[in-house]
Amino acid sequence: MPLLQLLKLVRKSSHFFEPVAQSAGGAASATGWNEGKANVPTQSAATLGDSNPGMHLTIGILAALLQREHTGEGTFVYQSMQDAVLNLCRIKLRNQIMLDNLGALPHYAVYPNWKWGKVIPRAENTEGGQVIGWTYKAKGWENDPNAYVYIVVQNSNKSWEAIANTMGHPEWITDERFQDWQHRQLNKEDLYKCIESYTVNYDKYELTKTLGAAGIPVGPVLDWHEIENGPDLNKDGTIVTIDQGGNRGKFKTIGLPFSLSNYKRAPDLGENNKEILASLGYDPDQIEKLTEEGVISKAQGPKNPRTEVIKGE
C-alpha cells in the first residue's frame, strides 16, 4: 500500500487505543534498544497516546476561547491522538531531518559504530539533545533492578571538568579520549565505563546529592514503591490521599501536577443556593420558604462524602 494511502487510513481510523497512538505517532519506533531480543518497537510507560491528547485538546480549547474573546468569533477545535503523540516526539523529526542531511547522529548511543540507514535508530537511554545522557549503575544494582542514576554530560569542557573532579579523576580532563565534545561523542563507550566505575560505589541517593551539589544534572531512577511512599511527594500534594467515606474509604492517587495560589475546592451539592438565589432577586425569607417546602434542598455532600484531601498520612 502506498505510504500516502496508509497515512490517510491511519488518520481516519476510529479504533485508536493508547498503544496504537504511540505506534502511529512515531514514539514506539524510536523507543527501545537496537540489538538483541529487546530490538522491538517499545511502548512508553507514560500514557503518551491517552492523557496527552486530552491535555493538547485543552490547550486548543483555551486558545479558541482566547481567540473568541478577541475576535467575537467561535471556531472548531480538532485534536487527534496521533497528532498529540507526534507533538511530544517532535525532536525525533528533528533527528530524522539531521540524519537525512548528515548521514549520522553523533548524539545517539550507537554512534559512531552504527550502520546508518534511512531511518533513525531507537534512542536507547540517550538524552534527546546534543549532550551525553545515560543511565548508570549505582550501589546495589545486583539485587535492585532500579538502583541506577541518570547523568547528563553537557557539551562544555567546564561540565566535564566538574564531573572529573567530583568523581576524583582529574586525569579524565586531559585524557585524549575526552578532551572535547567531539572526542567524548566518539568515545562514549569508554566514557560510560569511566563514569560507572565511580557510580557503582554509591547508592543512587548519595550520587544525586553529591553530583547535584556540583552542578551536574543527575537524578535517581525511582521505582513506584519509592514514589508511592516518598515523604516529599506525599507532603506537597503531588500524591494525595482521598477519603471517599462509606465503604470506599481512603485511597492514594496522583494530585494536580501544578498548584494555584488561590485554589478553592468545588462546592458541595446545594452549598451555594443562597448566594445564587439572592443574585436572582430572592430575599432571605423567600429562600428559607423554598427550602422548607422542599423546592430546593439544604446544602449536603454526596452519599460517599469526600470529606477531605489529606496531603500525607
Say what each PLM segment does:
Residues 75-77, 106, 114, 173-198, ...:
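Flexible, acidic loop-helix segments that line cofactor/substrate-binding pockets
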Residues 213-263, 310-313:
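A glycine-rich dinucleotide-binding beta-alpha-beta segment and adjacent secondary-structure elements
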Residues 132-214, 218:
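Aromatic-enriched alpha-helical interface/lid elements that frame and gate functional surfaces
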